[in-house]
A protein has these predicted regions:
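Catalytic domains of cell-wall/extracellular-matrix polysaccharide-remodeling enzymes
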Residues: 1-74, 114
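C-terminal domain-boundary segment and adjacent tail
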Residues: 4-15, 27-34, 48-50, 80-145
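Binuclear metal-dependent hydrolase catalytic cores centered on His/Asp/Glu-rich metal-binding motifs
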Residues: 73-81
């Protein structure tokens, strides 16, 4: 918690496996006063984009799409066109977890141009926001009342 405070960062990313159904893992992080949210990337997992809340109302947000060349050994799952299609086909309802997409970008196989290609291909009803605003919207629209 002290190092999180010193860094000025209050959102963490956890790279692990199968923690969305194990609150004992993420609740320890979210119990820290200087951590506001967790983005969860399941290594090798497809990711369902689930959003859960700890007992103190802080969210853990699972990846829904990946921008990662060769993620499935030859499938197109991590390619720009696939991610664009996935996002454009989903709900854009901010009051449903289905309306939010956390895209994990693999920095060794994709770059800023890949991200720009995805953004440029999104429908007009899709908003791309910085991570802190994403968390704020999730808390505001989906969090415990």
């Amino acid at each position: 918690n002290e190092y999180v405070d010193k860094s000025g960062l209050n959102i963490c990313n956890i790279l692990d496996q199968k923690i969305m159904d194990n609150p004992r893992v993420y609740s320890k992080y979210l119990a820290q006063p200087n951590i506001d949210a967790i983005f969860y990337t399941g290594y090798g997992e497809k990711g369902d984009g689930r959003i859960k809340f700890s007992d103190n109302g802080k969210p853990v947000i699972e990846q829904r799409s990946v921008l990662w060349e060769g993620i499935d050994g030859g499938s197109n799952r991590g390619e720009e066109s696939t991610v664009i299609s996935q996002i454009n086909s989903r709900s854009a309802n901010p009051h449903s977890a289905d309306g939010y997409t956390f895209v994990f970008v693999h920095c060794w196989t994709k770059n800023q141009q890949s991200i720009k290609t995805v953004i440029d291909g999104l429908n007009d009803n899709v908003r791309v926001v910085p991570v802190d605003q994403f968390v704020q919207l999730v808390k505001q629209n989906l969090g415990p009342k």
